Amino acid sequence: MNYEFERETGFINSQPSLAECLTSFPPVGDAFQSSSIKSSTLSHSTLIPPPFEQTIPSLNPGSHPRHSRPKQNPNGSCPLPAASLPPEYPWMKEKKASKKNQTTSTAATTDPGPLYFSPQGSPEISDGGSGATRRLRTAYTNTQLLELEKEFHFNKYLCRPRRVEIAALLDLTERQVKVWFQNRRMKHKRQTQCKENHHGDGKPPSLEEAGGRGDGKSFFEQVANNVSGALLEREGYPFQQNTLTSQQSQNGHNSDSQSATVSPLGSNDKHLKHFPNPSPTVPICTTTMAPDCASAQDNGSPSALDVSLQDFNVFSNDSCLHLSDAVSPSLSESVDSPIGLTTEAFDFFSETLTTIDLQHLSY
C-alpha cells in the first residue's frame, strides 16, 4: 500500500515521473511536435496549432494513453497535407489570377485566326500551337486610343511623370504608354514623308498648268499696268514733249524723213523701257503710233501732220510684221500662237490710246 501510495504521489508530484510519461510514447510525441512546428512556421497566424494539453497526452485529465492515441493520430495527420501544400497568400492569388487572365486572353486571340492586327495595323502571327512565349499585343479600347491621340496631338514626347499619370488614368502600364508613343511617332514620321514626296512630285505640273492657263490674263495685265505707268510718266512731262515735237517739226523741213522718224523713236524708247516682255508685235506698233498721233494733235501744224503721216507709212502693220519676221522667227510664231490678241483686246488697247490722246488735247 505504501509503495503504491508513494508511487502514486511520486507520479503526481515528481518531475522524473513526468519525464517517464513523456518518454513512454516517443513516436506520438515526435509526430505531434514536428507537425505543430511545421504548421506554425508555415501558416504563421492562419493556422492555429492544437492546444498544449492535446500534444502531451499525460496532462489531459481522464484520458488514457491507449484511448488518446487513436484520437491524436487524426489530429496529427491533418497538418501534414497543409505542410506539403503551402498556404495561398494574397500576392500568390494575384499572380495566379494574372496567369489565368493571360491564358484566357491567349485563347481568345488565337481562336479567331492565326493572324491578328494591332491598333497601329501591323500584323503579327500568333503562336497558337508552339510553346514559344511571345509578348501579346495590347488591344486598346476606343477611349484609350482617343486619350492617347489627344495627348500626342499636344505632346509628341512625354516626360515620365506625365506618362505615369496617363498610364494610371487609362488603366495601362507605363511601358504600354511608352511603346504606343514610340509607334505613333514613327507613324507620324512616315505620314509626313509621304506627304512631302507627294507634294514634291505634284508641284511642277500644277505650276505648269496654272502658268499655261494664266498666260493670256497675265500678259494683258502686264500690258495694262505698263500702259498706265507710261501714262503717268507722260502726264508728268507734257510740256517737254510739246517742245521736243515742235523742234522736230521745224527740223523736218531741213532734214530727210528718216531723221524725223528716228527722233520720235528716241522719245518712245523711254516708254518702251517699261515693257518687260514686248513679245507681241501689235502692241509695240500701236504704242509707237500713238505718241506720234498725240504729238501731231498737240502741235496742230501741217508739218507735224506730215511727220506723223510719214511715221504711219514707215510703221504700218505690214512693215511691223516684216520686221518681226526678220528679227526673230519666234515673234511671228507668237502671233500665230493661241495666246494672240483677240478683237476685244485690240479694242481695249485702241480705247486706252484714244483716251491718252484726248487727255493730251487739253494741253
From Swiss-Prot:
Pfam family, one: Homeodomain
Species the sequence originates in: Danio rerio (Zebrafish)
Region annotation (Disordered) ranges: 42-132, 186-218, 245-279
Cellular component terms (Gene Ontology): nucleus
UniProt biased composition (Basic and acidic residues): 193-202
InterPro entries in the record: HD, HD_metazoa, Homeobox_Antennapedia_CS, Homeobox_CS, Homeodomain-like_sf
Family matches, as SUPFAM superfamilies: Homeodomain-like (SSF46689)
A single MF term (Gene Ontology): DNA-binding transcription factor activity, RNA polymerase II-specific
Keywords, comma-separated and alphabetical: Developmental protein, DNA-binding, Homeobox, Nucleus, Transcription, Transcription regulation
Single GO BP term: regulation of transcription by RNA polymerase II
Protein localization: Nucleus
Similarity-based family: Belongs to the Antp homeobox family. Proboscipedia subfamily.
SMART domains from the UniProt entry: HOX
Annotated protein name in UniProt: Homeobox protein Hox-A2b
Superkingdom classification of source: Eukaryota
